[in-house]
Amino acid sequence: MIQDYLIIGIFLIASFIFGMVVLLTASLVRPKKPNKEKLSTYECGVETTGSTWIRFKVSYFMYGLVFLLFDVETVFLLPWAVKFKSLGLFALFEMVIFIGILIIGLWYAWKEGALEWK
């Protein structure tokens, strides 16, 4: 069993080293000739007008986080529902605890006003 983890660890270390070598090689080999054209903001092939830096409302981020939370819940809940009969009572209690934690998180987000549009 330790050998399995050793193989995974070696693979992770090797992939990390490979990624660093590729990034380092690319930064050493690339041409370094910055000019105004290369440093300008490019958006869909059209010259930008006005300021390219805009204020981003954090409420979009909070809605995205809550959506991601319940999207992950669906990823765990659907396979569990398919195998519900064969998993037994212990899996039911595990899922009740999981959903309970998510409900507490939703309640906290609601209480903090993360779901209100301001």
Curated annotation (Swiss-Prot):
The chain crosses the membrane at residues 6-26, 61-81, 87-107. It comes from the Bacteria. Its EC number is 7.1.1.-. One of its GO terms (molecular function) is NADH:ubiquinone reductase (non-electrogenic) activity. The keyword Membrane applies. It is found in: Cell membrane. One of its GO terms (cellular component) is plasma membrane. The keyword Transmembrane applies. Keywords: Cell membrane, Membrane, NAD, Quinone, Translocase, Transmembrane, Transmembrane helix, Transport. It catalyses: a quinone + NADH + 5 H(+)(in) = a quinol + NAD(+) + 4 H(+)(out). Its main location: membrane. It holds the Pfam family Oxidored_q4. It is a multi-pass membrane protein. NDH-1 is composed of 14 different subunits. Subunits NuoA, H, J, K, L, M, N constitute the membrane sector of the complex. NDH-1 shuttles electrons from NADH, via FMN and iron-sulfur (Fe-S) centers, to quinones in the respiratory chain. The immediate electron acceptor for the enzyme in this species is believed to be a menaquinone. Couples the redox reaction to proton translocation (for every two electrons transferred, four hydrogen ions are translocated across the cytoplasmic membrane), and thus conserves the redox energy in a proton gradient. HAMAP family: NDH1_NuoA. Belongs to the complex I subunit 3 family. This is NADH-quinone oxidoreductase subunit A. The lineage of its organism: Bacteria, Bacillati, Bacillota, Clostridia, Eubacteriales.
